[in-house]
């Protein structure tokens, strides 16, 4: 069984039921917090977070004043992207002014960014753990006339890529959902054949910037 969980906690009961029925489970994109899975296929979120930090350092220099907008607390995506970004932030000696949740939501991204901008007007760059929050933050910055602040998103959604191509969003770390699906089916095929599979299979990401 291949599952792409929208909620890492809620999916647990379904996986436990599959475990009882001896049905092998493979999770895609987001990990489950309960139950046993034979393999988890997902973007290398830690690497993506680090890529975002590296890009910010490249554009604004080390020791930059940065704000991070976090995803939904407890999700593997938010945790791993945050860990990767924080690793890069330490490496580049960023001054992390604030790191607050906006729950992967565009409207919350806008509201949280408005508040953080008031509290930290010296901000030079924003890393949002998904494109929705990045676009919300972008709107808040535009409204405040702060087009000097670099914003980097994550996921490579259609809206995110459009904003990058329009010169509004600095960059987005693009997931490759087609590749996650392809690898997931390949792993399922191996499981059905009784072959050994890795417990975690990372899928590479791509930095999307304006050409």
Model region roles, listed by residue range:
Residues 42, 67-76, 101-103:
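Short beta-strand->loop
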Residues 69, 73-77, 87-89, 176-211:
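Hinge/cleft segment of the Venus flytrap/periplasmic-binding protein
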Residues 41-66, 108-110, 157-160, 175-193:
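Hydrophobic alpha-helical segments within soluble ligand-binding/sensing domains
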């Amino acid at each position: 069984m291949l599952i792409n969980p929208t909620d890492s906690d809620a999916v647990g009961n379904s996986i436990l039921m599959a475990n009882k029925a001896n049905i092998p489970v493979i999770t895609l994109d987001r990990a489950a917090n309960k139950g046993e899975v034979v393999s988890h296929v997902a973007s290398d979120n830690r690497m993506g977070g680090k890529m975002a930090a590296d890009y910010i350092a490249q554009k604004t220099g080390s020791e930059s004043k940065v704000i991070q907008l976090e995803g939904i607390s407890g999700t593997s995506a938010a945790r791993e992207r945050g860990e990767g970004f924080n690793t890069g932030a330490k490496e580049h000696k960023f001054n992390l002014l604030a790191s607050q949740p906006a729950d992967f939501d565009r409207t919350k991204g806008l509201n949280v960014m408005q508040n953080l901008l008031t509290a930290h007007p010296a901000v030079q760059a924003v890393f949002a753990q998904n494109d929705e929050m990045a676009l919300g933050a972008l709107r808040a910055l535009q409204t405040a006339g702060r087009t000097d602040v670099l914003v980097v998103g994550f996921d490579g959604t259609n809206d995110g890529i459009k904003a990058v191509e329009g010169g509004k969003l600095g960059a987005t770390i693009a997931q490759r959902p087609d590749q996650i699906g392809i690898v997931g089916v390949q792993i399922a095929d191996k499981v059905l054949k009784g072959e050994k599979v890795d417990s975690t299979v990372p899928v590479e990401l791509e930095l999307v910037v304006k050409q």
